[in-house]
Amino acid sequence: MERSSSSSSSSCDKVWNLGLPYPTFTLANDDKPYLITVSDDHSVKVKNVDWISKLPDDVLLIILSRLSTEEAIRTSVVSKRWEHVWNQMSHLVFDMRKNIINSNNTLDGSNPVATLITQVINNHRGHLESCVIIHVPYQGGNGMLNSWIRLLSCVKRTKVLTLRYHYGTWDRKFKTFNFSPDSLSHPSLMSLSLHSYFLESSHPLRNCSNLRTLKLLSIVAPEIGVFNRVLASCPCLEVLVLGICCFKKSRVPLKIENKKLKLLQVSSLERIDAIEVSTTSLDILAIIDICCRRDDLSLQSPQLQFNRNFWVLGPYVPHISYNISEEKSIGNEEFVNTIYGELLRPFANLYVALSVSVDLMNPTEVERLRQVLGLWTRKILELEIIFKDNNGPREENKSWDKKLWEDNNKKDPFPNAKFRVDTVWMYNFSGSEEEFALMTCLIRQGTVVEKMMIKTSTFPARKRLKIEAAVAKLQALQTKLTIKCF
């Protein structure tokens, strides 16, 4: 094994000390590598064995993926074998907050950090799937960041791009950044996240039919028309996350008319009086904070159902409506991997209201319901369950249903042993065995803390009395929980 400098040993320690189940590899005093193997009564040294360097590139890349981009690049000094491994990494993160500590630094060719980032991108030889650039306030032109965007999208064909303008304590003035026209519209770009920018016009995002995911967080525009034009230029969006603000109010609503949209998250809307949402495919609607009045939200989405509206618990309680589907969806992945985590951040809202629509006769939907509910480590304020009308053959799923609920009742709580909710509301309740089995699970496990409400008022009198009698038996199982029909 070759070493490029005397500091290689510390670099080795940093790279290899990852807690992976590999043998201990070290350097002896004579600088020759050996492997230490431990038996019951003694240690054996096997010299001149470089196990790490003998691993294939894909395994080495897994090791590098656990390091920051900066640390991964430093492994190039470990040996010849590691020299070019980093430039095959599929994900790079450039965080300039670590290197620029005052506003006198410029984001241009004279800045050594900016120059180094350019060199790293140019030297990358693999498929660069995604890239994150976090930069700080600067003086001077906009050329360097626009240059990186062109390099990543046009040359590297990067699919996922995240740009964040970070404000430090040394810079409290609002500064603007001018993206070049069409700079964010390259056909290779599938996902774009912008954080903390002033979007003067929609020109950087014209003709973005390629985009599937768009996140605009802490984005300011002069007026609502800028955002409407941006959204109109992205007809194929499947995930849309908005945290936006306008300098001035207008009577024009924010219009979201994306037919393929699967997930819509509204983190905040400031100086926006009305919202019009029209989409035929929406499965997940997450309202984290909304400032408009109830009558100023128009929602046309046939797949999304909820009865407890977003204003019942107040404007500061996040409400999520989720149509559980058996289809694989980018919306479900985004919710599980990103949005849920945002709701559990420190200082985030402690209370959440959740509405779900589910077919209990569909095994895939039930497992996905378990996944969604199982995410929550905090108690949910309200859970609304809307049972879908089931028109499928009952006999095909009967044995599966029985086994599922029996397992859940005895040894596998649904969704897990920690999930808690203050109040559960059940709609479109038909009185089926599956629905009563789910109710029994939630009651016996102590999942519901205060109330369980079942809507039966739409049923004929005879059926309503039958269901209410069955509910009364459930109430008899315990005394702490209130179970009522309405």
From Swiss-Prot:
Q: Which InterPro entries match?
A: F-box-like_dom_sf, F-box_AtFBL13-like, F-box_dom, F-box_plant
Alphabetical list of CDD domains matching this protein? F-box_AtFBL13-like (cd22160)
Q: Which residues form the F-box domain?
A: 49-97
Q: Which named protein is this?
A: F-box protein At1g80960
Q: Which organism is it from?
A: Arabidopsis thaliana (Mouse-ear cress)
